[in-house]
Amino acid sequence: MGFLDFLKPRSKENVESCWPGGKMLQVHIEYNTQETVFTYFGRYGLQFSVPKSNLTNIIVKEVNRTHSVLQLYSGENCVGTSDLLPTEACNIMKNWVLQY
């Protein structure tokens, strides 16, 4: 992602999104229904994409009693890890991804 990419318009026609903590948490996950790709947008520019066909497992890994990370797996490999988020937000994103 380039420095000024945020200025480019992005088509949201075929995109569903989940903001687990609202806009204040600043993280969200999108699903492009046409390309069947999940894209995570985190804080400080963290971003990764995983095709739905490659996604084999979703794990909410607890870091402490209140916070966790969401990990997306393709086979044995972890292909994406979210920011450190409240466990409830991770569970919301996991359930949202599983509905597709």
Task: Annotate each predicted stretch with a short phrase.
Residues 2-17, 56-100:
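Acidic, Ser/Thr- and proline-rich intrinsically disordered linker/docking segments
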Residues 10-24, 33-34:
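N-terminal topogenic membrane-targeting module
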Residues 24-65, 76:
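Phosphoinositide-binding peripheral membrane targeting modules
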